[in-house]
Amino acid sequence: MTQIIDIEAFRADLSGTALTRGDHGYDEARSAWNGQIDRYPAVIARCRSAADVAAAIAFARQRGLEISVRGGFHNTAGTAICDHGLMIDLSPLHHVEVDPATRRARVGGGATLGELDAATQMHGLAVPAGIISHTGVGGLTLGGGIGWLLPLYGLTVDNLVSAEVVTADGRRLRASADEHPDLFWALRGGGGNFGVVTEFEFRLHPVGPVVHLGLFFWGLDQGTEVLKLGRDLFATLPAHTNAMITSVNAPPAPFVPERFHFMPGYILAIVGFGSAEEHTRVLAPIREALPPLFEFMTPMPYVALQQMFDEGAPWGVSCYEKSLLLDELSDEAIAVITDHQPRKTSPLSMMEVYRFGGAYAEVGEDETAFGGSRSTRFGVFIVGLTDDPESLAAARVWVRSFWEALHQHATDAGSYVNAMADIEEDRVRAAYGPAKYERLARIKAEYDPDNVFHHNANIKPALQPI
């Protein structure tokens, strides 16, 4: 009876709603993008304001409940959802307010990339972000934010101007270069360790609304040639162009000849943010150097580009992934990739090679808390995906074996915290390196000394704060 009275009193304190097991909407609210995640919070607080978030934190702390925070539910490890604790659900806070005159956007902590892109593109503007539209802005930003605009404008965190944060003791703070600069530094890469961000303010850039896409596809037997071609191409692309290498099964899309449907192979995707003429000049040498099995070139809206990979990573798919960073895509690393890629156990599984550099490399190593080195030239993501949950175990073995072999050629022991399916303390420490981790731990001790926010890629508070 006490729990029922507590819940009803808590509900009365919220402008949003509080759900418990059995309530209408509870199961939908606890669902995650990764279908492997199946957890049951004792309470789900669907917060409509920073005051709601503060009330939820106080309610949980008074009752000794573990706290997790949901932005978009897209984290592979499912850290947004806790068992038997209180989940702060920010999805009602999904506003996007754009000021085209100042090129700024204020974005709720529960907004998705699709909502952000749609609002900013109405003004021909964009924030560098990820490549799956149903990803949450919050989690993506706090871990870094890698996407198509990275070489043009950097990471998502490189474009964060300020953040409205509710801390573990219920304070509502604005973090920026001028206010709580230590907290602002930590939020730009340190994940959800320091508080609940209810609103982000981003710097916007002119993008689109039309961009230019080029796709080339080759079979698995040409993997070595494709990866070497991509390596050379990445180094010579013009400033307003980006590219990615992906190893996937060809989709049954209209632009794919039927005989190649579901065929495993390699895609080289080139996106031009400049003129059509410049894009044509970039593509011509590719087909001459290594004629593809098929190709596809088209202008397309930027928002469509941002949704291009949604179908390959649908909501509810079972996922396990690992990532690493490479200074060089050496011949030895290429040999590892071409050896392991044909061994994948699910047709949905994939490997992605991102191009770093450009604006990303122009940011100082210590300007943000982002874990990756700014000298890194390549990011490799090995993603096990399956629509059959029982077959994920085999995909997990493939991912781990692939990662272990490729890790011998990595920049260091680090990886991208947003792509950690296994949240382990040594991996988190390695992602940031000793100096950044120690600095983050001191800031953690200042703003969350009791480690209230630990259901994440956790940074433990230092014994002594700043």
Q: Residues of each region from the PLM?
A:
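Soluble FAD-dependent oxygen oxidases
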Residues: 1-466
